Amino acid sequence: MTAKPLHFPSRYTGPTVADVGERAVTLAIQRMAPSSRNGDDAAVLATPAPNTRTVVSTDVLVEGRHFSLNWSSAEEVGRKAIVQNFADIEAMGARPVAALLGLTMPGHTPLNFVQRLIAGMWDKTLQHNSELVGGDLTRADTLIVSITAIGILGGSSPALTLDRARAGQRLVASGPIGYSAAGLALLRHHGRTGIPAGFAPLIDAHCAPTLIPGRGVIARATGATAMTDNSDGLIVDLTTIARRSNVRIDLDSAAITPDSLLRKAGDHLGIDPWSWVLTGGEDHTLLATTTSDAPSGFRTIGRVHRTHAAAHVTMDGYPPTYTAGWESF
């Protein structure tokens, strides 16, 4: 079966990447995201300071699967690509310092689209005091954005790995939960232009999620032991921590109750907003376990207990109503 040709919105005008050629596209990217480390066969990064480690992560975004040009701008796709990759670095308690881009696209892709995509990436890398240091381009029928993020983990303390949650700790979160899923539901129902007023925070959370720089580093410095980001759904992501750590995580329903905006969206669409909170994912909110009080910028949303046969993740002591999440296959 032949794939349907990718359509770019009319706001992206001018020559295509096929018109100008690979070298001109590469030069345009370098101009939009200038870095002294970009432009050679490989990027040369400074040697990390003593008593530090390098952290690396990769995520791939596919048009039609992870984003849609029907409602996301090129800048938003670029911002989202960086945020979801840097969230993985932050979730280890590390600091993002660089990113590499792998980009596949059809020949009729407007050069202006690529420039705006890179502008979105550059905006987010600057927020984290990092750089886009290189990558690769190729032609394909599908628009695919792949980011490899590189970070630095300072000091000798362990990284915030998934297997270090312990009974007696509190579960803390930094950021919204359920907003991205609610935004996606609104977009699927209305498209970008038909959404009623007041839902902009939900749309923004899906199309261009935010990540406050340094939250993972702060959590690690103040006693957090395990951390992940809410990418595949709250229950799914917490179940991974619970299984790897051999504990049970009990959510406090009062701490994660859908707020007025989620309830309004749920009423509008006829969807239980709890499904967005528990299974939505793609908020890239940081979730951590700690023996200390909630770090700055975090709030307590549950407790860690010894494991038992009932479930790895419970809410107010009982199995949650919704347990699904994002899966690639």
Identify the residue ranges that each predicted region occupies:
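Extreme N-terminal cap/leader segments of soluble proteins
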Residues: 1-73, 92, 101, 116, ...
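Acidic, Ser/Thr/Pro-rich beta/coil linker or hinge segments at domain junctions
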Residues: 2-5, 13, 17, 21, ...
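Glycine-rich anion-binding loops of enzyme active sites
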Residues: 7, 61, 97-190
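General beta-strand structural signal in soluble alpha/beta enzymes
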Residues: 37, 55-57, 131-135, 149, ...
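Small-aliphatic-rich amphipathic alpha-helix that forms the alpha element of a beta-alpha
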Residues: 74-98, 119-127, 214-217, 233-241
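Active-site-proximal betaalpha loop/short-helix elements
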Residues: 108, 203-280
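Short hydrophobic/aromatic beta-strand micro-patches
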Residues: 150, 287-291
